[in-house]
Amino acid sequence: MKVSAAALAVILIATALCAPASASPYSSDTTPCCFAYIARPLPRAHIKEYFYTSGKCSNPAVVFVTRKNRQVCANPEKKWVREYINSLEMS
């Protein structure tokens, strides 16, 4: 039994190593996806820019980039998020 388990492990590892890497069928989009949102607003003065996550992500999100280059996910439906976006667009 131990021999067959070891043989199975070797076969699985060899298969994983030999499998061709699949490229993205659409593009080399490196935009991150968000799986959780920040619970409360960030200080507006800490935010320098923003971007939206890709439409390929399961959760729509706005990613705020702070002055220290931290990326923070926010819910685009929240009022404070929309206000921050408007403020960034005006500046």
Curated annotation (Swiss-Prot):
Any GO CC annotation of this UniProt entry: extracellular region
Name where it's found.
Secreted
Provide the leader sequence positions.
Answer: 1-23
Summarize what the UniProt record says about post-translational modification.
N-terminal processed form RANTES(3-68) is produced by proteolytic cleavage, probably by DPP4, after secretion from peripheral blood leukocytes and cultured sarcoma cells. N-terminal processed form RANTES(4-68) is produced by proteolytic cleavage by cathepsin CTSG.
What does altering H46A do? No effect on inhibition of activity by tick evasin-4
- Keywords, ordered alphabetically: Chemotaxis, Cytokine, Disulfide bond, Glycoprotein, Inflammatory response, Oxidation, Secreted, Signal
Please list the tissues where expression of this protein has been recorded.
Answer: Expressed in the follicular fluid (at protein level). T-cell and macrophage specific.
Q: Does the keyword Aminoacyl-tRNA synthetase apply?
A: no
Residue pairs linked by disulfide bridges in the UniProt entry: C33-C57, C34-C73
Q: Which GO terms describe its molecular function?
A: CCR chemokine receptor binding; CCR1 chemokine receptor binding; CCR4 chemokine receptor binding; CCR5 chemokine receptor binding; chemoattractant activity; chemokine activity; chemokine receptor antagonist activity; chemokine receptor binding
Q: Which domain of life is it from?
A: Eukaryota
Q: List-wise, which residues carry Methionine sulfoxide?
A: M90
Subunit architecture = Homo and heterooligomers with other chemokines. Interacts with the brown dog tick evasin-4.
PANTHER family named in the record: C-C MOTIF CHEMOKINE 5 (PTHR12015:SF170), SMALL INDUCIBLE CYTOKINE A (PTHR12015)
The entry's family comment says: Belongs to the intercrine beta (chemokine CC) family.
**Can you name this protein?**
C-C motif chemokine 5
Q: What's the source species' lineage?
A: Eukaryota, Metazoa, Chordata, Craniata, Vertebrata
